[in-house]
Amino acid sequence: MKGKYLLGILVILGALGYMVFGGLGRNLVYFLTPSEYLQDQARYQNRPVRLGGLVKPGTVQYDKDRLELRFVLTDGVAEVPVLHKGTPPGMFKEGQGVVVEGRFQEGVFQGTNLLVKHSETYQPPKEGWTPEEVRKLIEEAQ
């Protein structure tokens, strides 16, 4: 009788462990940096990958008519030109950390999905701020 209970508990714990750790691995966002890509370009040509880094200041160009966003992604060592079709996320800006999903084609990363990194920490307004300043801060963050 004890053996059946022990076996049942082990099966439940095994299933629970698989759900927790198996699901965790699928939800993590792994990405290449521009330096990693440049070290082995042939391996990643025409294959779906995630590329992560910072949007290089002064390189952002957005064509509203064609819905094309062009920018250079850098890790501080190497740079890769990116073309993303679609509207940029509201928090997208120069110097911002991003992860772009897509493929390398002819030396340009063709992005299909653009994820913007942001801080997970909430910072309350500093003392002495007026409600208008707080409202402006909130609007800029959206």
UniProtKB/Swiss-Prot annotation:
Heme binds at residues 118, 122. It is a single-pass type II membrane protein. GO terms for cellular component: plasma membrane. Residues 24-142 are periplasmic. Keywords: Cell inner membrane, Cell membrane, Cytochrome c-type biogenesis, Heme, Iron, Membrane, Metal-binding, Signal-anchor, Transmembrane, Transmembrane helix. One of its GO terms (biological process) is cytochrome complex assembly. The keyword Glycoprotein does not apply. It comes from the Bacteria. The chain crosses the membrane at residues 3-23. Coiled coil: none annotated. One of its GO terms (molecular function) is heme binding. Residues 1-2 are cytoplasmic. It is found in: Cell inner membrane. Its main location: membrane. Belongs to the CcmE/CycJ family. Heme chaperone required for the biogenesis of c-type cytochromes. Transiently binds heme delivered by CcmC and transfers the heme to apo-cytochromes in a process facilitated by CcmF and CcmH. This is Cytochrome c-type biogenesis protein CcmE.
